[in-house]
Amino acid sequence: KIYTRCELAAAMKRYGLDNYQGYSLGNWVCAARYESNYNTQATNRNSDGSTDYGILQINSRWWCNDGKTPGTRNLCHISCSALMGADIAPSVRCAKKIVSDGNGMNAWVAWRKHCKGTDVSKWIKDCKL
């Protein structure tokens, strides 16, 4: 599923991401925009052989099991394919674990590059939340 910006903001809010670990909703919507372009089916292969999955590009080396990444830790106890469904609840649950892991949203390269230190409120502007 490809979400619209405001549709995703509403879903993320419903699942409790607004101000989770102190990160406003705009941060999460911005991260999703630059990680997956709001597409739940996005995948990207990494040079280490792992793959990133779903709207927040969650990595198979650490967080989910795709059956092909050697030595996966699967810290979210989930199959990577479950992170690619139209319902973002599994991705949100795993993202909450990731953001609580010590590095906050710095775990997402796209967030560091494009969202960190910017006015992220624009990402939820004009959304009926």
Curated annotation (Swiss-Prot):
The gene is LYZ. It catalyses: Hydrolysis of (1->4)-beta-linkages between N-acetylmuramic acid and N-acetyl-D-glucosamine residues in a peptidoglycan and between N-acetyl-D-glucosamine residues in chitodextrins. Disulfide bonds join C6-C127, C30-C115, C64-C80, C76-C94. Its EC number is 3.2.1.17. This is Lysozyme C. SUPFAM superfamilies: Lysozyme-like. Monomer. Lysozymes have primarily a bacteriolytic function; those in tissues and body fluids are associated with the monocyte-macrophage system and enhance the activity of immunoagents. One of its GO terms (molecular function) is lysozyme activity. Residues 1-129 form the C-type lysozyme domain. Lysozyme C is capable of both hydrolysis and transglycosylation; it also shows a slight esterase activity. It acts rapidly on both peptide-substituted and unsubstituted peptidoglycan, and slowly on chitin oligosaccharides.
